Regions:
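Alpha/beta-hydrolase fold catalytic core
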Residues: 1-36, 58-61, 99, 127, ...
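Active-site loop/oxyanion-hole signature of alpha/beta-hydrolase fold enzymes
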Residues: 26, 50-53, 58, 64, ...
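Active-site glycine-rich loops that stabilize anionic/oxyanionic intermediates
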Residues: 33, 41-44
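The conserved beta1-alpha1 loop
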Residues: 39-41, 232
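Conserved hydrolase catalytic core segment
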Residues: 100-140
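Conserved alpha/beta-hydrolase catalytic His-Asp/Glu region
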Residues: 158-212
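Conserved serine/cysteine hydrolase catalytic core
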Residues: 190-249
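Catalytic histidine-centered segment of alpha/beta-hydrolase-like enzymes
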Residues: 259-275
């Protein structure tokens, strides 16, 4: 059994500080296993990986779960820009600091970031890629629902109960927690209100149109010659069955796992099944 993670800092693009949870750092340099770098989705943070991170650490992997810029405890972008290219530059910088072979596990935004980072860093640096409920040709309706949730509450909540109600409405398939203390990892209390941990500019500032990058992201994925696995939540409205089928036709060497009880937030919705799939993939 590996001890729990410690907090670590990394340098992103432009020396921006990125904060992560890190397991098994002391044994990484002489391990034959790759480092696992876990990248969350938009509006999430490193704590979404806590269970799977611990499972991987218990199996001897050096694991890093990273807060993206403008999320969690990482610095916010001074210019308010959160394009996928900027996020990818952050990750290529982190990969250089890790300095050993890495498998990237990326959910949603983190998966798209991982595609570009893997392409830019090369197969000696990134040796595998897990895409968690994301493909370059994702569903507009599903991503619009995510954006609506994030922008609707940009001015925060009066109480934790209000935040819990908002999450329950957004994720009706999840059980509403009775103890709301865990929400404080996703919220910050200032000026008498609870605000989401992410920079409001992430959803309010002008950024790149993700649909304008479909061709680039798709071609980057096709060009990758490393092992790839797509994990889809069966209840997802972001990756449709047709979208997954199209992806697998274009990236025929990719493996595919579908989690029957999970939606877009697959890592948390069906955590045991998710962790089992990830462990099997990275252990080969």
């Amino acid at each position: 059994m590996s001890p729990g993670p410690h907090t670590a800092q990394f340098r992103g693009d432009g020396a921006l500080v990125l904060v992560g949870d890190e397991w098994n750092r002391a044994t990484a340099s002489h391990s034959e296993l790759p480092t696992i770098l876990m990248l969350h989705g938009g509006g999430q943070n490193r704590f979404s990986w806590k269970n799977t991170g611990q499972v991987l650490a218990d199996r001897g992997f050096h694991v890093i779960a990273l807060d993206a810029r403008g999320h969690g405890d990482s610095d916010r972008a001074p210019d308010g820009r959160y394009t996928v290219d900027t996020l990818a530059r952050d990750i290529t910088s982190v990969l250089e600091q890790i300095g050993r072979p890495v498998v990237i596990i990326g959910a949603s935004m983190g998966g798209l970031t991982g595609i570009l980072a893997a392409q830019q860093s090369g197969p000696q640096r990134v040796t595998g890629l897990v895409l968690v409920d994301v493909v370059p040709r994702f569903e507009n309706q599903g991503t619009a629902r995510i954006r609506d949730f994030m922008t609707r509450h940009v001015h925060g909540f009066e109480t934790l109960e209000q935040a819990a109600d908002a999450i329950a409405a957004y994720l009706p398939h999840r059980q509403r927690p009775r103890n709301l203390d865990g929400l404080t990892k996703n919220l910050r209390h200032r000026e008498g209100r609870w605000h989401w941990h992410w920079d409001p500019a992430f959803v309010t500032a002008a950024g790149d149109d993700p649909f304008a990058k479909i061709e680039e992201l798709e071609q980057a994925t096709i060009d990758l010659k490393i092992p790839i696995m797509l994990i889809r939540g069966k209840l997802s409205d972001v990756v449709s069955p047709e979208g997954a089928e199209d992806f697998l036709a274009k990236v025929p060497h990719a493996e595919f796992v579908e989690l029957s009880d999970a939606g877009h937030t697959a890592a948390g919705d069906d955590n045991d099944a998710f962790s089992d799939a990830v462990v099997a993939f990275v252990s080969r």
